[in-house]
């Protein structure tokens, strides 16, 4: 399931409900976390 953080975003640990946190759980394809919509 795609991350709600944004496109190009991958969940490090997918929850059973298929949701992820836009934090350390959010990994971007690039080096910019803002690309995933992460605040950090």
Swiss-Prot record:
Organism: Drosophila melanogaster
GO MF annotation list: metal ion binding
Membership in a protein family: Belongs to the metallothionein superfamily. Type 5 family.
Top-level taxon of the source organism: Eukaryota
Keywords of the record: Cadmium, Copper, Mercury, Metal-binding, Zinc
Biological role stated in the UniProt entry: This protein binds cations of several transition elements. It is thought to be involved in detoxification processes.
UniProt-recorded name of the protein: Metallothionein-1
Induction pattern: Strongly induced by cadmium, copper and mercury.
A biological process term (GO) from this entry: cellular detoxification of metal ion
Domain writeup: All cysteine residues are arranged in C-X-C groups. These are thought to be the metal-binding sites in other metallothioneins.
